[in-house]
């Protein structure tokens, strides 16, 4: 078999007809600047062709469901294996998708509980077991010899009434004795029962002494008792002991019933097992009292009830005033000072009690009626669910929040599933086991107490679960829980989960293509990830990893550097060889960083800030352990810590949302904290994340940064435009007039293929240029508007150098390292890192107030060390203007450049949530307990 993948003439995107050889069964890292063509080579050429060939080998019938895959622009590829891509863009946003379902661990857990689980009565009556007549007979015969007993069939359990017809039927069926409320009577001599009291009635089927030769009689009596007692029977051993048996999974005491244990009972995605209240989501949209009464110190007259604000309408305030007068509630008392009964009345209504309501609207319409008072919470709920108006529904939605389901307590399953425990009544139910971190889950599996029979059944199931948990542990995800929603995972986390699933499959001879698996991973966990990658390689697989992490590069078997620049300045193979060979290559920027010839210098001094702080006290969301944190303003701050230590919770869930709530009146509720101070020192909050800058191809760098408005102004001022009477709007592809109407200014036509993927083809009228021919006849410096949109940022900067207003905005895009993108490049084609830098560019040309807080979550994602150097210069410009920049980051080059570090830990999950170290990088490097400090110390010494 060929030991190389040989590629000839690859031309996808910016690749310049390249030839490259990649060794098989090795760990190969593809690196290079952002936009240099790494992904074009790895994903759009190698993976696309591997996938296409696999699909081509399937039948025509199967292919119609998979769609026809386009052949990548390449002359030939030899030595390809079936390819599996593990990227970061395919995270499921479905609320039913969890870590447990993605890794298939849930499937094995469901099987485990169905096979060795024991149901327990939810009312505390002990284990619920189902026994056949044969099993009951065996248990009775196991009682001590000469035990006197009577077999009873329970027919009435805790029911009121005289039950005369039941006694008549018992007599008719030929039975002689009954036990009523614990006393034995002849069926003809039962005293009259009280109608208003609850009674228990059992029929005496037989009286026996346990001795040889009674099996046959006992069996007949047991069957008769089960038949008469609807599957239940009691054995009264005359010495005061009673044994309860059932041939159903049903509690003999209270009748709580469990269906037959099967895997679907433990699935929250099946109606059979899901919680009936939340339909298996674990959360329910409920009215949030904190949003309904945002300021409890206000009285009802002062507008304590936000949904009934008199500004929008006086209907509900009038109703409130008249109802409170009728029920004797003082409208001038602060809401928090009302009695509990009064608050319940205001919130949930008066029930059946009515008041007289009189109201005249602005048009003279009158309402004069006696009605119950609805209550504000009930009112918001009703209007949300009953309205046909999207506007009203959105307004009501603003007073609601997704709260933990009160029925299943967030476990997603019904009572019948949650009453089943493994390892005895003290053992966990499936909901509790899913709430454990991966590390704790592993420990629990090792300590599980099972009977010999249960161990035999559970052994192969537990092995599968254990293996999958171990793989997750090995890729640095030990802090995650199986119940964690897949939509809340970062790109790096979801990729490593799928990586763990692939390791678990133990396939060999496969070509795996990974996109920056080290994202979101602390340096401490990186070694474990690299070991996992090597393990996959050692199974006989080829791994092609697009990566910027130096450790991964140095441990690779083969390194390919794509460059030298980005966009049209990239697309060539600059270096290919072992890491040591690439490090010696003078043309390779990557090689220069690996050899230490190029590096990001440590700042000569740290900024002292402006002396002000934002201080959070008692941060206790998720795993945060009631932290008190100070964020010094006017500095470059890095929040660090191992994966799962609580960085995102502190910054994104608490700080960002609390500031947004105060500054922007954002309805999004922050996580749990006691108090926050210092927000008055901030005027603007700018969250610069990696979400797309636009959801449609109509959004592009020119429109996003606002430079397109200036360019359209310029074209409208040309002589040709003035002669034709064209205004600025003529040069927009979003409105009628100048755009091509055949494609509505998209430049492409979408052809719906029904069960195949939609196909996009260039518009035949405008040939992809978006405008009609008349608009394209207007030129500025011999270029029309479509040609300007096709220019790269670098070219546009030269082209518009004489127009300072335009050049200044374009310069900011170049400053963030995006000189290679075209002005009209669709936003949907930009990577997360490129979108984030585009947002930075749009901030750069705004006038700085010096009171802005910029928050960035892992801004180095997708960035080469050379790009990081550029990014740091941009961030430092913000700080030098007096603003505060706060980053969540693992990259040591960024961390060492910060003025102030807040290091969380020491571990992830329950072992984290504490502040391990704070201060300058030099101070944190001296803290022995800090993992970040340990790696930072080495970096600072370099």
From Swiss-Prot:
Cellular-component GO terms for this entry: cytoplasm; excinuclease repair complex
Residues in coiled coil: none
KW Cytoplasm (keyword) present: yes
Secretion signal span: none
Annotated ranges, domain ABC transporter: 308-589, 609-937
Keywords on record: ATP-binding, Cytoplasm, DNA damage, DNA excision, DNA repair, DNA-binding, Excision nuclease, Metal-binding, Nucleotide-binding, Repeat, SOS response, Zinc, Zinc-finger
SUPFAM superfamilies registered for this protein in UniProt: P-loop containing nucleoside triphosphate hydrolases
GO molecular function: ATP binding; ATP hydrolysis activity; DNA binding; excinuclease ABC activity; zinc ion binding
PROSITE patterns listed in its UniProt record: ABC_TRANSPORTER_1 (PS00211), ABC_TRANSPORTER_2 (PS50893)
Pfam families: UvrA_DNA-bind, UvrA_inter
UniProt-annotated binding residues for ATP: 32-39, 641-648
Subcellular location field: Cytoplasm
C4-type zinc-finger residues: 251-278, 740-766
Gene3D superfamilies linked: 3.30.190.20, ABC transporter ATPase domain-like, ABC transporter ATPase like domain, P-loop containing nucleotide triphosphate hydrolases
Record-level GO BP terms: nucleotide-excision repair; SOS response
Family: Belongs to the ABC transporter superfamily. UvrA family.
Cited PANTHER family: UVRABC SYSTEM PROTEIN A
Subunit structure of this chain's protein: Forms a heterotetramer with UvrB during the search for lesions.
Role according to the record: The UvrABC repair system catalyzes the recognition and processing of DNA lesions. UvrA is an ATPase and a DNA-binding protein. A damage recognition complex composed of 2 UvrA and 2 UvrB subunits scans DNA for abnormalities. When the presence of a lesion has been verified by UvrB, the UvrA molecules dissociate.
Name listed for the protein in its UniProt record: UvrABC system protein A
Protein source organism: Streptococcus pyogenes serotype M6 (strain ATCC BAA-946 / MGAS10394)
Gene encoding the protein: uvrA
């Amino acid at each position: 078999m060929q030991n190389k993948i040989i590629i000839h003439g690859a031309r996808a995107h910016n690749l310049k007809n390249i030839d490259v050889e990649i060794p098989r069964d090795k760990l190969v890292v593809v690196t290079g600047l952002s936009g240099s063509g790494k992904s074009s080579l790895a994903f759009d050429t190698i993976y696309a062709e591997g996938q296409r060939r696999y699909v081509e080998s399937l039948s025509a019938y199967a292919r119609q469901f998979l769609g026809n895959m386009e052949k990548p622009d390449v002359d030939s590829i030899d030595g390809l294996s079936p390819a599996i891509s593990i990227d970061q863009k395919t995270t499921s946003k479905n609320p039913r998708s969890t870590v447990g379902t993605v890794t298939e661990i849930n499937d094995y857990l469901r099987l485990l509980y169905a096979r060795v689980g024991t149901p327990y009565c939810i009312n505390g009556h002990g284990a619920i077991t189902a026994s056949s007549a044969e099993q009951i007979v065996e248990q009775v015969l196991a009682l001590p010899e000469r035990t006197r007993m009577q077999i009873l069939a329970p027919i009435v359990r805790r029911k009121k009434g005289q039950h005369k017809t039941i006694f008549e039927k018992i007599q008719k069926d030929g039975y002689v004795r009954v036990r009523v409320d614990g006393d034995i009577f002849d069926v003809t001599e039962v005293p009259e029962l009280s109608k208003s009291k609850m009674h228990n009635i059992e029929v005496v089927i037989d009286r026996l002494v346990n001795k040889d030769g009674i099996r046959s009689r006992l069996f007949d009596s047991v069957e008769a008792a089960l038949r008469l007692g609807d599957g239940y029977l009691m054995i009264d051993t005359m010495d005061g002991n009673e044994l309860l048996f059932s041939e159903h999974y049903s509690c003999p005491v209270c009748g709580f019933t469990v269906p037959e244990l099967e895997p679907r009972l433990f699935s929250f995605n099946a109606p059979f097992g899901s919680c009936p209240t939340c339909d298996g989501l674990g959360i329910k949209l409920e009215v949030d009292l904190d949003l309904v009464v945002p300021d409890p110190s206000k009285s009802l007259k002062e507008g304590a009830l936000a949904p009934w604000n008199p500004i929008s309408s006086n209907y509900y305030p009038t109703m409130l005033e008249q109802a409170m007068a009728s029920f004797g509630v003082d409208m001038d008392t602060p809401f928090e000072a009302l009695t509990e009964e009064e608050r319940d009345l205001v919130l949930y209504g008066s029930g059946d009690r009515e008041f007289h309501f009189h109201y005249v609207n602005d048009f003279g319409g009158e309402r004069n009626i006696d009605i119950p008072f609805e209550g504000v919470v009930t009112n918001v709920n009703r209007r949300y669910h009953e309205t046909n108006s999207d506007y009203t529904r959105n307004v009501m939605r603003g007073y609601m929040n997704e709260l933990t389901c009160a029925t299943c307590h967030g476990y997603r399953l019904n009572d019948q599933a949650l009453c089943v425990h493994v390892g005895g009544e003290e053992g966990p139910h499936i909901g509790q086991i899913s709430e454990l971190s991966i590390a704790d889950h592993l420990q629990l599996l090792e300590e599980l107490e099972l009977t010999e029979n249960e161990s035999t059944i559970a052994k192969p199931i537990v092995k599968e679960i254990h293996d999958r948990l171990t793989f997750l542990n090995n890729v640095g995800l030990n802090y995650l829980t199986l119940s964690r929603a897949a939509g809340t995972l970062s790109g790096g986390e979801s990729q490593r989960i799928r990586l763990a699933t692939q390791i678990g499959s133990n396939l060999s001879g496969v070509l795996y293509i990974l996109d920056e698996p080290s994202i979101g991973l602390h340096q401490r966990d990186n070694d474990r990830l690299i070991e996992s990658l090597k393990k996959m390689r050692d199974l006989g697989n080829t791994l092609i990893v697009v990566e910027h992490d130096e450790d991964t590069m140095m441990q690779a078997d083969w390194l390919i550097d794509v460059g030298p620049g980005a966009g049209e300045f990239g697309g060539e193979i600059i270096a290919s060889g072992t890491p040591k060979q690439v490090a010696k290559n003078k043309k390779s920027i990557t090689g220069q960083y690996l050899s230490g010839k190029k590096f990001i210098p440590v700042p000569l001094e740290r900024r002292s800030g402006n002396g002000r702080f934002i201080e959070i006290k008692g941060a206790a969301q998720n795993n945060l352990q009631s932290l008190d944190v100070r964020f010094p303003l006017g500095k470059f701050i890095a929040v660090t810590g191992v994966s799962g230590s609580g960085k995102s919770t502190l910054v994104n869930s608490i700080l960002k949302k609390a500031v947004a709530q105060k500054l922007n009146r954002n309805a999004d509720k922050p996580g749990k904290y006691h108090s926050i101070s210092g927000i008055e020192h901030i005027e603007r909050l700018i969250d610069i994340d990696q979400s797309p800058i636009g959801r449609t191809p109509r959004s592009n760098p020119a429109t996003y940064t606002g430079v397109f408005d200036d360019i359209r102004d310029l074209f409208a001022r040309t002589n040709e435009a003035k002669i034709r009477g064209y205004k600025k709007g003529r040069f927009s592809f979003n409105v009628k007039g100048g755009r091509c109407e055949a494609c509505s200014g998209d430049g492409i036509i979408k052809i719906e293929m029904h069960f195949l993927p939609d196909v996009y083809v260039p518009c035949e009228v405008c040939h992809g240029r978006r405008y009609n021919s008349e608009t394209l006849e207007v030129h500025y410096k011999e270029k029309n508007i479509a040609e300007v949109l096709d220019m790269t940022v670098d070219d546009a900067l030269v082209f518009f150098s004489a127009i300072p207003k335009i050049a200044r905005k374009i310069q900011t895009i170049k400053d963030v390292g995006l000189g290679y993108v075209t002005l009209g490049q669709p936003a949907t084609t930009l990577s997360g890192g490129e979108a984030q830098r585009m947002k930075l560019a749009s901030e750069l040309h705004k006038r700085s107030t010096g009171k802005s807080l910029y928050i960035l979550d892992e801004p180095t994602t997708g960035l080469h060390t050379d790009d990081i150097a550029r990014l740091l210069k941009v961030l430092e410009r913000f700080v030098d203007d007096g603003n505060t920049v706060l980053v969540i980051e693992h990259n040591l080059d960024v961390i060492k450049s910060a003025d102030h570090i807040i290091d969380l830990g020491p571990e992830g999950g329950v072992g984290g949530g504490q502040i391990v170290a704070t201060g300058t990088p030099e101070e944190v490097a001296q803290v022995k307990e800090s993992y970040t400090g340990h790696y930072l110390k080495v970096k600072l010494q370099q």
